[in-house]
Design a protein with these regions (language model features):
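Active-site region of chymotrypsin-like
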Residues: 6-18, 23, 82-87, 110-191
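Serine endopeptidase catalytic core focused on the charge-relay Asp
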Residues: 11-12, 16, 20-21, 28-33, ...
Length: 192
């Protein structure tokens, strides 16, 4: 299957998660799987997505880990969506320092589209790598993908920007974001 390079075509596979308690988050449809951050699902009551005009409840994940504070663990939830046919794929490449990734997500419960560049800064620890974004990604963007050459190379799991635009950690740039590597996600899916 040919890779989609145009972000305007890719963004249709980035979905806002809807929940009864209005917790915000995103995920991405890759093949017949919906992938997001585990902490997003953990905080949601009755999470679901809209796919092809249908409301799909997110129940019975095939992979679920909510270990967002351990770099050797995982912050991920993966759901099988049998009738989904997304052309997106997970990359087996870990981005290197200087690589420019494309991030896209939805905030305000799917009303506000956010697109930005994320430059990999070389910080890597365990299953995660960091990048500096040219727009402030906040909690509503958690679970959203980053792309390199039309492939998903990571899922946003943490940022350094509080909702009031102050840094979580003053020693790091406000634009710092942390992504779970798609290579790690592929390895997890092979064992589940």
């Amino acid at each position: 299957m040919e890779k989609i390079q145009n972000i305007n075509k890719i963004k249709q596979y980035v979905l806002s998660i809807i929940s009864d308690n209005y917790n915000e988050g995103n995920g991405v449809m890759v093949g017949n799987k919906f992938i997001t951050a585990g902490h997003v699902i953990f905080k949601c009551e009755n999470p679901n997505i809209m796919w092809n005009g249908k409301k799909i409840p997110l129940i019975n994940p095939i992979v679920f880990h909510n270990d967002e504070n351990d770099s050797d663990s995982y912050d991920i939830a993966v759901y099988s969506i049998p009738n989904a046919k997304s052309p997106l794929v997970l990359s087996d490449v870990v981005p290197e320092k200087g690589d420019v990734l494309k991030s896209c997500s939805w905030r305000m419960l799917g009303e506000e589209y956010v697109e930005c560049n994320a430059v990999v800064n070389g910080l890597k620890e365990g299953n995660y790598y960091a990048a500096d974004t040219d727009k402030q990604l906040k909690s509503g963007s958690s679970g959203s993908p980053v792309f390199l050459n039309g492939e998903v190379v990571g899922i946003l799991c943490a940022g350094n920007c509080n909702d009031d635009n102050t840094p979580c950690n003053t020693e790091w740039p406000l634009s710092l974001c942390v992504f779970l590597s798609s290579k790690v996600i592929l390895e997890l899916l092979e064992t589940n």
